[in-house]
């Protein structure tokens, strides 16, 4: 298991007009890597590898991030109802080089999710739980939102928010063991 600590960073996650889901994720993940690396350097923190990630739901090239209000969550769920959409997570594992440069390796995971058609009552009841409020696309497959999912093609953990296999591949790239028995 990898020991970790949370490093709080702040990046602008607003969409840019005509930006597709993949371009958006690439930009946000790179911004997060840069912000984390700069914070480590500026605050003279221990030079440890750092992981950043961001997840979006997309349908017909439209990005569905986290809803900002209950009304926004309601609109998102209504639009995703009865669709097959994509959940994409961009992840990067960064580190500070000996020359104090921010370096990183990056990966993505894509999962197709088929959502059943939702009634207005189902959407309203779900939004009232407040579960949608911190989830890309306004639903959580690991919670009550699972009742809306007819099926997935790809990585379940990606839909939850962190694709484990892709994360392990990045750790392997930097020779970081994630097994409790150290190599």
Language-model segments: residues:
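Anionic-ligand binding patches
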Residues: 18-183
